[in-house]
């Protein structure tokens, strides 16, 4: 499946535009970069959730390579992760378990809301996208980017979401490590 096949099969929202003025270049910063809060980003990539479902976010301070990334639910009543910590938002929403606990597990899957393309520019050449417009593109480290494709309608069939992700990986549009 090619990027064109994916775009045809799964219509996408236009580029997500985050309304903010570019910031001035300063100590440690880059000029022309749009600033967005964690809360605004989560709201943009999860414009609608199945009833009773929540987005999952993982957050930790310190070295992100040490230890796990436990997920917690995100909703307006909870505090968003700090911009000072390492944060990760998954592409799917999940239902709480029967005991009320929240875990990002297949058994609690609600819907897939976007595709995340990781390691663009390093493991996956940016020209591999061949002019495809992403919903967002974030430089996560020098020369390494994460891109996203917000789906027009969330996929509520987990098997379909897995097949789509596998097709994106098989097409060479994302690092194979994104499947786990």
Predicted features and spans:
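DNA replication initiation on ssDNA origins
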Residues: 1-114
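Short aromatic/hydrophobic-glycine micro-motifs
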Residues: 12, 51, 134, 173-174
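Structural beta-sheet core signal
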Residues: 56, 147-149
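Structured loops at beta-to-helix junctions and adjacent beta-edge loops in soluble globular domains
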Residues: 60, 92, 118-120, 140, ...
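Surface-exposed flexible segments
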Residues: 66-72, 126-136
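DNA replication initiation modules
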Residues: 99-132, 151-180
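Short, conserved phosphate-binding/catalytic loop or strand-edge motifs used
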Residues: 138-146
């Amino acid at each position: 499946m090619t990027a064109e096949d994916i775009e045809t099969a799964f219509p996408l929202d236009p580029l997500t535009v985050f309304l903010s003025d570019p910031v001035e270049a300063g100590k440690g910063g880059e000029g022309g970069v749009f600033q967005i809060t964690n809360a605004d980003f989560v709201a943009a990539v999860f414009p609608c959730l199945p009833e009773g479902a929540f987005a999952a976010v993982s957050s930790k301070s310190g070295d992100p390579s040490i230890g796990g990334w436990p997920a917690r639910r995100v909703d307006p009543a909870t505090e968003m992760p700090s911009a000072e910590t390492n944060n990760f938002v998954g592409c799917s929403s999940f239902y709480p378990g029967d005991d009320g606990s929240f875990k990002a597990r297949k058994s609690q899957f609600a819907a897939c809301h976007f595709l995340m393309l990781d390691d663009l520019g390093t493991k996956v050449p940016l020209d591999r996208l061949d002019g495809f417009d992403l919903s967002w593109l974030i430089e996560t480290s020098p020369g390494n980017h994460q891109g996203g494709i917000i789906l027009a309608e969330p996929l509520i069939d987990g098997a379909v979401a897995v097949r789509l992700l596998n097709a994106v990986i098989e097409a060479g549009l994302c690092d194979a490590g994104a499947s786990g």
